[in-house]
């Protein structure tokens, strides 16, 4: 995102058309992979009341914190989707969708560079400002997601260790 923003805000963004368009397509897409919790066991523990049967407070606390952070992460994905939608609206004022269309194959993969004569739509400084703001928002949520996914992994690893020790598991 930083490189894309740098090129778009350079004195001569047309010099970077071939580099900008592929990035601009990818920014407007949702991630093809995400952390999707398989939380059937967790839901069963909570809904059946079995979570209260666990006597070890460290285990209950760790399970609860992990579950809260999983729900938080799923909420952040919704925020990210919203940010992507706002980006698309701003990008539609700057980029030529026909150029995007020529760059992708039947699987929606970016396979070609834009044509040599490709350009941007005429846009105002205000429209570029809006686009920059949307890039800023996406950058922020991407950083937050990476931070929180690392925390979630650390929590999951810690929870597994607590369970192994507390219940003598291998």
Positions of the model-derived regions?
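Long, hydrophobic alpha-helical segments that serve as membrane-spanning/inserting helices
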Residues: 1-170
